[in-house]
């Protein structure tokens, strides 16, 4: 007698996420700093309304539990394409992608923007370790819990270092890499890790200051009016208003930071190396060096852009990522 035949339906082509977040009267999540109300950039305001927190299990050092981790989730999760996962620069947040994220969605790419542990807008009142290993482990647990498929991992500046570090440890989680103005050859935080904590906290307070952030912004962008630079500076330091930020930054500084130069030659994933024509922070020569050391890479330059082309020239960045994802570029 024949056994019963079970017919298994194929997976649905897409899954639609339900977004649940408590918002204030202006639509901003209540966990964001009140200074969000002062931001003028309409792209930042729109993207801020989509920031959510999702529980990510984490076991590092003496920390055991779940971190309510801030990110921007795609409205629809596809099952037949690699998702695009956006990291951010050093000491920044997912709002860095305010001008690029909506264009990636328009290009029909499933896109996540994730706040690296210790930065962004997560709930870290019970502070876990925020060293490089913890940041890597947190990203892996988020990927394993929610994304679950090899991803196109995109990292600008120090975010490229985070991406290389992650890929070297969890190659199975990555389909392709996009490294934008990569700061991949820095040797950690150097002698900062030897500072007494009192001095480290003083340095972190300086890092948070508006004048220093404004100066960094002026260097980062090719050309933007002062009023725009001021607003963008406020966007870039918004996460610094989180109550745990100083402790997380000091923990990262004294941990030694990232040192991934020795991993680069072992990365064999297809990689798009992107450099900007007018980057005043990271030399284009480092992008060429990266191209030469990676086993499977191509290089493209973004015209009329400084260190953050995904803010200044988002259409060009989206075209590069879209073509790279579809195989047209490589």
UniProtKB/Swiss-Prot annotation:
AB hydrolase-1 domain sequence ranges: 84-315
InterPro entries documented for this protein: AB_hydrolase_1, AB_hydrolase_fold
GO terms, molecular function: hydrolase activity
Null mutant phenotype: Stong decrease of tocopherol (vitamin E) content in seeds.
Keywords linked to the UniProt accession: Chloroplast, Hydrolase, Plastid
Gene Ontology CC terms, in alphabetical order: chloroplast envelope
Subcellular locations according to the entry: Plastid, Chloroplast envelope
The EC number(s) this enzyme carries: 3.1.1.-
EC class of the enzyme, as a word: hydrolase
KW Kinase (keyword) present: no
Gene3D superfamilies registered for this protein in UniProt: alpha/beta hydrolase
Pfam families: Abhydrolase_6
Signal peptide: none
Family that this chain belongs to: Belongs to the AB hydrolase superfamily.
Function: Hydrolase involved in tocopherol (vitamin E) biosynthesis. Releases prenyl alcohols from chlorophyll biosynthetic intermediates, which are then converted to the corresponding diphosphates for tocopherol biosynthesis. Provides most of the phytol from chlorophyll for tocopherol biosynthesis in seeds.
Protein's UniProt name: Alpha/beta hydrolase domain-containing protein VTE7
Organism: Arabidopsis thaliana
Gene: VTE7
